[in-house]
Amino acid sequence: MAVVTPDDEMTARVGSNRHSTFEIGSISKGLTGMLYRNAVERGLVSSTTILGELLPLEGYGEVGSVTLESLATHRSGLPGLPPGMHPLRRTLGFWIRGENPYGDSLAGLLDQTHAVRVGAPRPRYSNLGFQLLGHAVAEAAGSSYAQLLHDVLGPEFSTPARVADLGPADLTGFDRFGRPMQPWVGEAIAPAGGIRSTIDTMRSLLRSLLDGTSPGMSALDPTAKFTPRVGIGAAWITLEHNGRSITWHNGSTGGFSSWIGLDRAAGTGVVVLTAVHRSVDRQGFRILEEFATRAR
């Protein structure tokens, strides 16, 4: 866990060290949102750029006509997962044997979009959408997603594509019953849920978000409604919690859970990472409220 306030930075660890990396799950979407907004600011893409301008989607139906902005705000009409991924079969492998359901290459992901239908442009959380967004932005930058992440947000974030890419510092995650789970590695999933980080790297990110120096900061600013009382920027969620405006995202993989939240008015933020598949949302909100109250 890490806490950043206007006056201090704190880190607490149990069962890990400063070099240990965690799967941050869907917090990866928050980083991808920042890469997207940074690319807009640099003139590489615009909010109206469509996928078909950046990825080889000719003959793939409606997918190529989806805009990057609609992907960033989960309003693209894309499903959560592509039907060509055979999600039921993969889900069974995950639940029964703890397998990684997301080991695809980018080429494999694009192949799976052939049968995708684009629905109404209403809020719908989509892993597929953020996978495509991240790789499209990387293509606009003339880079891979992994390289773009390193170039813009720092080389401390890793995106292992294979189990062989993992090292001793990369923790093994466990389900809530203590069963070790296969790591969620894969080229395709990186922008939506495949990033690894240490707690110190996440603390540094938190500081840069609070002081406004991080590239792609505008990703945190809500530009649309996700639900009637919840705003969304480029992945980042903003809501009222006990009278305070909180900007946050969480993450969950087969063996890890994560949470990052900021009370921007109080200049305070919290990150929680754990190598167990058990939600830490409640703890994250509670700790943030406690430290933000002290900071005010």
Regions found by a protein language model. Name each.
Residues T5, S16-N127, S143, D175-P180:
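Active-site-proximal loop and beta-strand segments within enzyme catalytic domains
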Residues M1-R13, H19-E23, S28, P83, ...:
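Catalytic loop of the DD-peptidase/beta-lactamase superfamily, centered on the K-T-G motif
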Residues M10, E58-V66, G77-P83, P155-D165, ...:
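Secretory-pathway/luminal and periplasmic proteins that interact with or process carbohydrate-rich
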Residues E41, T73, D111, G154, ...:
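Residues at helix-coil transition
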Residues N38-P56, S65, A140-G167, S214-P222:
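Short, well-structured active-site flanking segments
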Residues T32-G33, G129-G134, D200-S204:
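Well-ordered alpha-helical segments within folded domains of soluble proteins
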Residues T67, S126-G129, P160-G173, F177, ...:
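Mid-domain, small-residue-enriched loop/turn segments at the edges of structured enzyme/sensor domains
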